[in-house]
Amino acid sequence: MINKVDIVCGLTWGDEGKGKIIGELLKNNKYDWVCRWNGGSNAGHTIYLNDKKYHTHIIPSGILYGIKCLIGPECFVNIDDLNSEMEYLKGHGFDISLLKISPYVKIITPSHKEEDANNPNSTGKGIGPCARDKYARKATQLKDQCPESLKSFLMTEDLHGTILCEGAQGFWLDINYGNYPYVTSSVTLPYSACSLGFPPCKINTIYGAAKIYDTRVGFDPDFEYLWQPEEETIERIVEEGKEYGTTTGRPRKVTWLNYDKLVKAINISGTNVVIISKVDILEIVNKFIILKDNKYINYETLETMKTKLGELLFNDCKLIKKIIYSDHPEHVNF
């Protein structure tokens, strides 16, 4: 029996610090399962545990905390990438026997990856071509071509207890709501988490992650319009905020927080708790700016910005119960 489900999702273009939010939730709450519902190894989560930094891509972060994990049926799996990540975690002393994989995940083939390799707006992981074959009903499910080494990891039981779902990418990379076609190949909104095998009525809290400024990797004309790479402040934010993709290593494009897009993402996703991270970076550059109604608003101090931004969000997003500002690189103070 499923008791309740909490969900962590991105509210912008990914890279919002979902990994450290998940880590903090796992430290302070009892979950029976941690489940990944979308994407593949094109995503990347950074987790700090016992003063060490770990990276995961397709395997849910719960594996680092000794919790059972599930890679759900909406995910795309490259067998070689999965094996490499399992070996990486095993080499660091983590129990990979806690991992389960839906038999319905779609397998990324070498031809998928080869086709995707020269796409400058992709991570080159083969996700797009595999997704295309999925909807053409040509992709292979893991249950139909499962290597012997992975058969013991196939999910054969029903989810139960208390579940934490971790999303990949972010709202504005969603295949439907993002600036198509400059998007990812899966649904990034929380409703897609129900594909793991639970009804929507079991969802308890949706945690939405954002940063105090906006970033993205890859081309998007809407983002390019606002991006000002020649500005010294933007360059410094990239360096001070370590704005490099976990998966690609590419520097992220940075611009000021788009308030209207954040509000839309919060309201459509149903976010209850908003976590806005890296607020300390704006103190370093001493600029406190948001974009609202296509006009830039400059605040004198970070505290003023946080206060005014909070007032605006509570007024425009009626489902919000709490807003958390985080400046710590390793964890969030709930």
Regions found by a protein language model. Give the residues of each.
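Non-transmembrane, aqueous-exposed alpha-helical and coiled segments at domain scale
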Residues: 1-334
